[in-house]
Amino acid sequence: FVTQDVIIKRKDWLSNLLQPIIDNECDASYSRQISNNNTIEKYIRESNYPNISSIVSKADINALGLKAFFFSDASSAIKREVFVKLNGYDGKKFPTNEDMYIAYKLIINGYRIKYCADSEVIHSHKFTFKQQYKRYYDTGRFFKQNKFLNNYKVNKAGSNLAKYVLKRAWQEKNWSVIVNFLPNMIARYVGMKMGKKF
């Protein structure tokens, strides 16, 4: 799976994405995403897509909580036989987060997902506050439609991410990010809350 807004960063992007599946290290894989803009998204990408690869399985759910189902189909691969066996997306239509839905099915059914840090793509957005609100409104709708995901803890993922973003923005003297951080987070929070009430 590759979305239309992804830019390939490395020539070995595809081979590095597929080889772990071919070698039976995992059953699904996804690429490292790098933002080429200087917004909050840049630091969120750094946190969510580090430079070290990792594999997640059912055994990691207790430690990771909801983050065990983190997966991005912006640049990803799934074994065909596994995708067919699991009936893919079950014919459902999602407002967003369809990648989390399939990741949940993979992990719960005993399959492994690998994050491939050496498969790099550029994937960037510059959302206005209104667009950010809409994005998280749709995310809230997704969680309302798939309430079983609310059984998994978020742990400290949100607060850790906020600390990371502010720390990195301060290090780089990125004042625009620091000034816009609070309204950006409010747009996300309110959007999510309203979406869950949809």
Place the predicted regions along the sequence by residue.
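Conserved donor NDP-sugar-binding/catalytic core segment of glycosyltransferases
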Residues: 11-43
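Short beta-strand-to-loop acidic/aromatic patch adjacent to the donor-nucleotide binding site
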Residues: 1-7
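A short, conserved alpha-helix in the catalytic core of glycosyltransferases
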Residues: 76-78, 82-87, 93-119
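Non-catalytic, C-terminal membrane-associated alpha-helical segments of glycosyltransferases
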Residues: 135-141, 145, 149-198
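Active-site donor/metal-binding and catalytic loop motifs
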Residues: 109-133, 139-146
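Nucleotide-sugar donor-binding loop of glycosyltransferases
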Residues: 3, 32, 117
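A recurrent flexible, glycine/aromatic-enriched loop bordering the glycosyltransferase active site
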Residues: 59-78, 94-95
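Short, hinge-like loop/turn segments at secondary-structure boundaries
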Residues: 44-49, 131-134
